[in-house]
């Protein structure tokens, strides 16, 4: 049988669609298979967003593992449909953690290898931010930084190096899309300013491209292999109807939980497939000051970032952390809860408490652990496919030590404001599913070019290919890896 396209891509998020764009631009034919549907931004607003998959039982937690709110979307656009737009690069030192500090893993590629693709990804995502010396660059960011908030200005004095957080929310209108409106609901932007892959489809008319076919409502059950190659994909649609897609080259771009699930269902369960799962630790740290902090104002919910805890000699024993001043201040749900507990007349006025509380959104790095893994469950999802069962034990001492050090140090740095830490609460975890098909020259699932170690025409792209993860949001690096893979596939075919 004849292959239906030069390349079959599984998944239509950041990685899948950026790769498809690169291939069709170079004259290659592409078939994209997407388990979910295509829902416009207007439809998302009407329905209040996309249904996150932790609500639809595609996975469960292993007995004894802590419940963890893994959230992801099946749908055209993938994670771009519900991300907040944060788009920093990794630091150069994030690629050499083991060489520099004797822990974790090095990447098989360097910052310099990825740098030109960072520039291209920033251009395509219309990233706004500062040109910070921490991140050597060969080209400027396409959009100026969002103006700093009062909280940023207060934090910058104590938390150098400090600058604007790079983010794919335009600070000025561009290409017919408005600037960020400051609504703070970035995951479902009310004016459609925050970049999504739907913008790429619309602006470049990709769905009308003669060399691109997008099939929605089609899940990949398993890969057929023979003689060191993938030969076909067995698929199932929403009505549980079966089909087979012949393939000359396959790229898995379905995310950190689905990529390994497809390999496991295909009995391609090498030593590392599905293991080394990681996500960022995410904490809101509340500091109460002796004066107003300026919370509740700013262009959007986060505009600045501190790299004071992002790198240093201590990374041999405690993880990197990215500290983001939270312009919103105390979340309304916490205020209501605490007011109910305290009772009327026994708590200070809420207005005073809000004004004097400085909140930091802190992303933390942990070391990859083999115990953190996904495997197949005997239970089935609504398409009849085995669910993934996730084992995600508690944070390691490497992360806990970093968190304790940061909390104590924040009080010291803000001592001039009479600061004391009054709360540290879990927030926003589960959106970054990384590491389950990591890249390595001799170990791992794929090599430095994202090619599977055993099958010459199988590639895995996205966060699942990360060998380690630092404290930085992964999206821009996912995009850069996809663009680099696109260059390589065009050059070698």
Task: Cite the ranges covered by each PLM segment.
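Redox-cofactor-proximal catalytic regions of oxidoreductases
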Residues: 51-134, 370
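Residue-level detector of alpha-helix initiation sites
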Residues: 13-14, 150, 257, 465
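Glycine-rich loop(s) and the adjacent beta-strand/alpha-helix scaffold that form part
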Residues: 25, 29, 36-41, 223, ...
């Amino acid at each position: 049988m004849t292959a239906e396209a030069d390349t079959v891509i599984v998944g239509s998020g950041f990685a899948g669609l950026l790769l498809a764009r690169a291939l069709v631009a170079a004259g290659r034919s592409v078939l994209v298979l997407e388990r979910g549907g295509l829902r416009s931004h207007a439809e998302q607003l009407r329905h209040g967003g996309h249904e996150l998959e932790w609500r639809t039982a595609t996975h469960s937690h292993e007995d004894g593992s802590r419940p963890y709110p893994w959230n992801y979307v099946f749908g055209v656009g993938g994670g771009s449909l519900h991300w907040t737009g944060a788009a920093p690069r990794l630091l150069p030192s994030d690629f050499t953690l083991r060489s520099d500090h004797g822990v974790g893993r090095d990447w098989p590629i360097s910052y310099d290898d990825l740098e030109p693709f960072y520039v291209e990804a920033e251009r395509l995502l219309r990233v706004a931010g500062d040109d910070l010396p921490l991140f050597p660059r060969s080209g400027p960011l396409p959009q100026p930084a969002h103006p700093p908030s009062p909280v940023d200005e207060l934090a910058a004095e104590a938390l150098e190096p400090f600058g604007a957080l790079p983010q794919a929310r335009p600070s000025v209108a561009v290409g017919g899309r408005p600037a960020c409106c400051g609504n703070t609901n970035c995951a479902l932007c009310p004016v459609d300013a925050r970049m999504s892959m739907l913008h790429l489809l619309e602006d470049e008319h990709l769905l009308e491209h003669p060399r691109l076919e997008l099939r929605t409502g089609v899940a990949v059950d398993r890969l057929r292999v023979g003689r060191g190659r993938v030969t076909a994909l067995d698929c199932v649609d929403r009505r549980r109807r079966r089909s087979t897609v012949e393939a000359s080259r396959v790229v898995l771009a379905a995310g950190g939980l689905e990529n390994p699930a497809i390999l496991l269902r295909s009995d391609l369960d090498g030593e590392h497939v599905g293991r080394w799962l990681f996500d960022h630790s995410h904490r809101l740290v509340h500091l109460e000051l002796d004066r107003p902090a300026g919370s509740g104002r700013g262009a959007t919910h986060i505009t600045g970032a501190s790299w004071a805890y992002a790198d240093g000699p201590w990374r041999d024993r405690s993880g990197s952390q990215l500290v983001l001043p939270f312009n919103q201040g105390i979340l309304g749900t916490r205020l209501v809860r605490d007011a109910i507990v305290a009772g009327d007349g026994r708590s200070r006025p809420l207005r005073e408490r809000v004004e004097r509380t400085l909140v930091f959104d802190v992303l933390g790095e942990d070391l990859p652990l083999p115990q953190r893994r996904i495997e197949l469950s005997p239970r089935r999802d609504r398409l009849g496919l085995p669910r993934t069962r996730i084992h995600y034990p508690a944070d390691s001492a490497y992360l806990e030590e970093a968190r304790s050090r940061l909390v104590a140090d924040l009080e010291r740095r803000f001592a001039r404001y009479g600061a004391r830490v009054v709360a540290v609460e879990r927030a926003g975890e589960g959106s970054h599913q990384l590491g389950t098909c990591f890249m390595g020259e001799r170990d791992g699932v794929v090599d430095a070019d994202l090619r599977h170690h055993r099958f010459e025409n199988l590639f895995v792209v996205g966060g699942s290919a990360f060998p380690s993860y630092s404290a930085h949001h992964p999206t821009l690096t996912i995009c850069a890896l996809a663009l680099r893979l696109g260059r390589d596939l065009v050059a070698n075919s």
